């Protein structure tokens, strides 16, 4: 394994997805680690982090992971995603875990920045060496999601996304900034695992996959480990059972365990909030200030150990949360953390002849971190199309 595979990606890939001429639909997954978007023009992702900079901040040259946000009303400027992470040292204590990963983060300035950046990213398309905003004043409709046990927070999430938005983005290697001025009147929130179930049942053109009937009629579990939570979503013959959310099993816990192992082995403090940039190289640095010495230390094996430990705990939780597991036919594994855990899950459950483990990206082959957001988008597309046909 490579540690950089655990770092949240920064990308936007232009491609044609099913669209509708009466609404601009945006699927947005505001994860604790990464923000994912899906629209008729493509899909993209960036780390869920932003850092305010001076208004005269400039970069020496555009970078592939560059995202700079400017509020068109206040002039406030923020670095977003990987660049914001990269300029922040491991000793920076300005961001607490509660600010970044707390359940009630909706009213923080950072959450506003990353959610508006996501809205803008879902409106762009590559045009030669630049990106351009191609929303043609259609009504903006957003479909997003929350962990099963957090659905009572839906109104607070909607409140942060509704209304008027005016900002500018400098994106990636594009030479021209892009302005966005639009309103959002409709925001829909669904349980996160439902997004993956919809994604696995629907093809890119919005029609049902040939195997969708199996997933809708059999006993199915959606196993959705995210950054902050593990969602277990049982479905029996099309009837959705009460889901289960564990807020201590996910990639955040993996990084917390890794941080503790690094401290124990190398006596280096790397808090979870600063771990992302070190995943790029898989190395941390010890610094002897008195004698002007420094040394790098590889933590790949420590990350692998922590990843396996937390995955095993998650599977133990699955066993306890679903006592009749042997009666289920499919276990759908989804999310970026699910992709990191998939080999362990397949090996651990290989003795269950009656249960088939399925990756949620099986009919699109996008990275599994996009499974929920793809499902968000296609579910809203299907709902609007169904309404039009009535």
What are these regions (language model features)?
Residues 1-220, 240-242, 247, 251, ...:
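Nucleotide/phosphate-binding catalytic cleft detector across ATP-hydrolyzing
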């Amino acid at each position: 394994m490579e540690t950089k595979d655990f770092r949240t990606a920064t990308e936007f890939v232009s491609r044609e997805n099913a669209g509708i001429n009466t609404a601009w639909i945006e699927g947005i997954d505001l994860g604790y680690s990464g923000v994912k978007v899906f629209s008729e023009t493509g899909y993209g992702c960036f780390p869920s982090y932003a850092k305010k900079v001076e208004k005269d901040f400039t970069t020496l040259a555009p970078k592939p992971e560059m995202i700079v946000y400017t509020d068109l009303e206040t002039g406030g400027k923020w670095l977003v995603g990987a660049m914001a992470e990269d300029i922040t040292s491991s000793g920076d204590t300005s961001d607490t875990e509660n600010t970044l990963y707390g359940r009630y983060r909706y009213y923080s300035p950072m959450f506003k920045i990353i959610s508006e950046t996501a809205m803008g990213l879902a409106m762009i398309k590559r045009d030669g060496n630049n990106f351009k905003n191609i929303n043609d004043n259609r009504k903006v409709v957003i479909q997003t999601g929350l962990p099963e046990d957090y659905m009572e927070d839906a109104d607070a999430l909607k409140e942060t996304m509704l209304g008027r938005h005016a900002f500018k983005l400098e994106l990636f290697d594009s030479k021209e900034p892009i302005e966005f001025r639009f309103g959002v009147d409709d925001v829909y929130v669904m349980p996160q695992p439902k997004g993956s179930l919809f994604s696995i049942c629907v093809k890119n053109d919005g029609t049902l996959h040939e195997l969708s009937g199996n997933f809708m009629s059999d006993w199915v579990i959606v196993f959705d480990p995210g950054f902050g939570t593990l969602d277990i979503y049982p479905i029996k013959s099309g009837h959705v059972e009460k889901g289960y959310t564990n807020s201590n099993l996910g990639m955040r816990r993996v990084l917390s365990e890794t941080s503790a192992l690094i401290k124990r082995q190398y006596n280096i403090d790397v808090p979870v909030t600063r771990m992302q940039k070190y995943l790029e190289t898989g190395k941390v640095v010890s610094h002897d200030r008195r004698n002007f010495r420094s040394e790098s230390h590889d933590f790949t094996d420590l990350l692998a150990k922590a990843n396996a430990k937390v995955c095993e705990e998650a599977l133990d939780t699955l066993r306890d949360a679903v006592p009749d597991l042997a009666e289920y036919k499919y276990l759908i594994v989804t999310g970026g953390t699910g992709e990191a855990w998939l080999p362990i899950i397949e090996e651990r459950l290989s003795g269950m002849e009656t249960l088939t483990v399925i990756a949620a990206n099986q009919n699109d082959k996008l990275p599994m971190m996009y499974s929920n957001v793809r499902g968000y988008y296609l579910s809203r597309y299907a709902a609007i199309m169904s309404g039009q046909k009535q």
